[in-house]
Amino acid sequence: MDDASEQIAGVDEVGRGALFGPVVAATVILSDGAIEQLVAQGMTDSKKLSPQRRMILMNQIREVATGFRVGMASVYEIDRLNILQASLLAMRRAVLGLPSTPQLCLVDGNQRIPNLPVPQRTVVKGDQSEPEIAAASILAKVWRDQLIVRLDQRYPGYDLASNKGYGSAKHRQALRELGPTRQHRLSFAPCQASLLPD
């Protein structure tokens, strides 16, 4: 690889605040040319993009990325470790799953990934300033959203296809009426409250 930027991986996670489902991380390595192309297509923080735009960009990222990988931590791991440690575990799994080892990981936020045998730098709001992190945020968001839509078929009644596992009014109401599923995070207060008798 003759382009130094091809050795830089962006890492981000989604689903930290959700009540349902795993936390998902992605890592993406992009060449300078790929960054230029994706930025010209409007790539930015996934939260600022419509679902349709995220899907288009996700397909473009997968086409032009030097490498990418998704990692996740299960609801069981979230409840056992806590959401921060589970998020970092998902990030670590994503990076270690890359086909080649990057020279540097740019990690969104202010927490370093523990036990990562790769140099890393944390970047607060990195999904807004680092193209590699923005790409990772899009990949992770689309992947997790698609998973939650599939799980909505298995666990009807919680409006998961709409809320993507986050604590909307409908979701909280369903928790009170139906109780939690195996994919709800019992370490989160709204899920715990649904287990208490009225």
UniProtKB/Swiss-Prot annotation:
UniProt domain RNase H type-2: residue ranges: 6-198
Catalytic activity, reaction form: Endonucleolytic cleavage to 5'-phosphomonoester
Gene Ontology CC annotation, any one: ribonuclease H2 complex
Protein residues bound to a divalent metal cation: D12, E13, D108
Keyword check for Ribonucleoprotein: no
GO BP, sorted A to Z: DNA replication, removal of RNA primer; mismatch repair
Cofactor note: Manganese or magnesium. Binds 1 divalent metal ion per monomer in the absence of substrate. May bind a second metal ion after substrate binding.
Keywords, in A-Z order: Cytoplasm, Endonuclease, Hydrolase, Manganese, Metal-binding, Nuclease
Keyword check for Cytoplasm: yes
Molecular function, one GO term: RNA binding
Physiological role: Endonuclease that specifically degrades the RNA of RNA-DNA hybrids.
HAMAP family: RNase_HII_B
Name the record gives this protein: Ribonuclease HII
Originating organism: Acaryochloris marina (strain MBIC 11017)
